[in-house]
Curated annotation (Swiss-Prot):
It holds the Pfam family TBP. The gene is tbp. Belongs to the TBP family. The lineage of its organism: Archaea, Methanobacteriati, Methanobacteriota, Methanomada group, Methanococci. Sequence repeats lie at residues 7-83, 98-173. InterPro entries: TBP (IPR000814), TBP_archaea (IPR033711), TBP_CS (IPR030491), TBP_dom_sf (IPR012295). GO terms for molecular function: DNA binding; DNA-binding transcription factor activity. This is TATA-box-binding protein. General factor that plays a role in the activation of archaeal genes transcribed by RNA polymerase. Binds specifically to the TATA box promoter element which lies close to the position of transcription initiation. One of its GO terms (biological process) is DNA-templated transcription initiation. Keywords: DNA-binding, Repeat, Transcription, Transcription regulation.
């Protein structure tokens, strides 16, 4: 049975121009904050889709908090439209690339994290963090496994890798269970 894997965050980046006047952009964009003494970029929060966009003077733009690449692209198009309408020189259809996706799912059981921590590529220090950190090399992702059975997969570039990672972890846990019990 396929696990129900849900994307909870997508981070993308793109280049919308060069030498962006962030003071001017902050004045024309709704919900924009620019405090260069705090952070070198302009922060703009949208409610639909619910994302945060970080725009830097260099023209680099990061979008975080999206639930899909498509949502991030919609948000970026909205910002580009506003900036262009205000007379700024902005790239029309910039190439958007996924930097990271975070997905969640459930194991469907309460794992023994102490047992799993005997495996290679795992870290488990419950005094520091309640989840077990499992680093996979193919796909190159980090899987956090919690005692409740909740799983968080981060470092994804494509959703398919979440399913591959989950299948690998599930198979490894089944093998471990057979060895131990």
């Amino acid at each position: 049975m396929e696990p129900e894997i849900k994307i909870v965050n997508v981070v993308v980046s793109t280049q919308i121009g060069t030498d962006i006047d962030l003071e001017y952009a902050a004045d024309i964009l709704d919900n924009a904050e620019y405090e260069p003494e705090q952070f070198p970029g302009l922060v703009c929060r949208l409610s639909d889709p619910k994302v945060a966009l970080l725009i830097f003077r260099s023209g680099k733009l990061n979008c975080t908090g999206a639930k899909s690449k498509e949502d991030a692209e919609i948000a970026i198009k909205k910002i580009i439209k506003e900036l262009k309408e205000a007379g700024m020189e902005i790239i029309d259809n910039p190439v958007v690339s996924v930097q990271n996706m975070v997905a969640t799912t459930e194991l469907g059981m309460e794992p023994n994290l102490d047992d799993i921590s005997t495996l290679e590529c795992t870290e488990y220090e419950p005094e520091q963090f309640p989840g077990l950190v499992y680093r996979l090399s193919d796909p190159k992702v980090v899987v956090l496994i919690f005692g409740s059975g909740k799983v968080v997969i981060t470092g994804l570039k494509v959703i398919e890798d979440a399913y591959i990672a989950f299948d690998k972890i599930s198979a490894t846990l089944k093998e471990l269970e057979q060895e131990l019990y």
